[in-house]
Structures are given as C-alpha cells and as structure tokens.
C-alpha cells in the first residue's frame, strides 16, 4: 500500500496549548478560528470565533493580522505536501464533542452553501456505511451543529478549488462525553470534559478508530474507482436532500 499511498502524520499542531491545557496557542489565539475566512451567517456566540479579547476562549486574533505561526505551518504543509496530489484525504482528530463519534466535513461557515465535492463525500459515507453497517459514527457537515468563523479546513478547502485535484478534509470528533457517565469525577478538571482521562479508556478510544483509518487508507488507494461512481447526478440530489433540505 505504501508504494501507492503517502501517509503524513502530524501528531500535534498546538504544543503550547496542549501544555497549558487550553484550546488557544501561547498567544491566546484559537487556531481553529484563526483563518482569514468569515461566516456570513449567524454563528454561535463566542464559540463561533470572536475578536473581543484573548482572555476569552475561541479568540480569532486581531483583524488583518497574519495567521498564527502554527496555522501558517499547517497551511504550508498542506499546500506543499497534500494539495498537489490528484486525490487526498485529511482526518483531523479532535477530542471531546458530544456523546457519539462524529465525522465532519466543510463548511463550518455556512448552513446554506454545500461544498463543491458534496457528492464525493456522500458516496464516501455510503461506502463506509455499507462496509461497516454497525459502526457508530455520525457523518455530516460541521454546519449541522454550529457555525464558526476562521475554520482552517474551510480555508484550505477553498484554496484547493484553484486546481482540479480533489481534497477532502474530514474532522473526527471523538465522543468523549460518554466517559463522563463512567467517571463523573473527571469533571473536576477542565480536561475531563474532553478526554477519557483513565489510561485504559484512552487506549480503548484510540483503538476504536483504527477501522475508520484503515477504511480511509483503502479509499484513498482506490479513489479512481469510487470517484467515477460518485459522479452520478442523483447522488448529489440525495446528498442535498440529506444535509441541505
């Protein structure tokens, strides 16, 4: 497989934030709200991204400033190593939103505008559901949950449209709230809202997503086969009916 598919692993984008136990980087900026892209629709208060103060979470940074060094590093890496490929998938792994495992795709900025490759994502979802009918993932646009300004994957996906290559960025939200029911005492620390905390539970969470990662690897390997099948017009109509009624 590795003779035909390249795998890049970026284990950590925000080391200072990880060290400090915060979403923000060392300058108080939330990297996932830092891209120069704005929602024209109503975003969730504060959590959708704001420019009020770095003392508040989800701070975007000052208007007109360059992106933060970590965000620039990620964008440069994607532009140089990923976007030139005829087909590429990204899985951005996040801990802590909801009780279910969720796979999100752009846009985070709009409930009204679907991405150009909607039918391709829909067919990828269909393949996953057919291959693993008993999986526990909710697969849908991020905008089904909330809207944000400055989403890095919205920005990078928009950049990818300048070429004919297909770039599908996915975000895995691991349903870590379920672990609160197992161990309510972990809420005594902020990390407990987003993290299983106990080592054996953390290992179980990580193991549970290996099937998804293997599926995405094989989907990338055979992309030409299923991309051709995803070109049917009725697939786009089905996707619109499901996600943008």
Question: Which residue stretches match the model-derived regions?
Answer:
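Structured catalytic-domain cores with a bias toward divalent-metal coordination
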Residues: 1-245
């Amino acid at each position: 497989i590795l003779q035909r598919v390249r795998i890049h692993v970026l284990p950590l984008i925000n080391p200072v934030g990880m060290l400090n136990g915060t979403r923000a980087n060392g300058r108080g900026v939330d990297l996932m709200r830092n891209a120069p892209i704005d929602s024209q629709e109503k975003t969730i208060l504060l959590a959708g991204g704001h420019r009020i103060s770095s003392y508040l979470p989800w701070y975007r940074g000052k208007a007109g400033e360059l992106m933060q060094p970590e965000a620039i590093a990620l964008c440069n890496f994607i532009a140089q190593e990923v976007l030139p490929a005829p087909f590429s998938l990204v899985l951005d792994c996040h801990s802590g939103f909801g009780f279910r495992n969720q796979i999100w795709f752009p846009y985070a900025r709009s409930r009204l505008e679907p991405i150009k490759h909607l039918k391709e994502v829909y067919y990828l979802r269909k393949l996953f559901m057919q291959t693993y009918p008993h999986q526990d993932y909710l697969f849908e646009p991020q905008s089904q949950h909330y809207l944000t300004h400055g989403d890095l994957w919205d920005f990078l996906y928009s950049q990818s449209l300048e070429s004919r290559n297909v770039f599908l960025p996915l975000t895995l939200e691991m349903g870590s709230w379920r672990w609160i029911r197992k161990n309510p005492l972990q809420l005594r620390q902020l990390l407990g809202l987003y993290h299983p905390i106990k080592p054996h539970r953390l290992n179980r969470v990580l193991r549970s997503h290996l099937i998804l990662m293997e599926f995405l690897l094989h989907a990338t390997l055979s992309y030409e086969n299923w991309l051709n099948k995803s070109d049917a017009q009725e697939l786009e109509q089905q996707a619109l009916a499901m996600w943008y009624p």
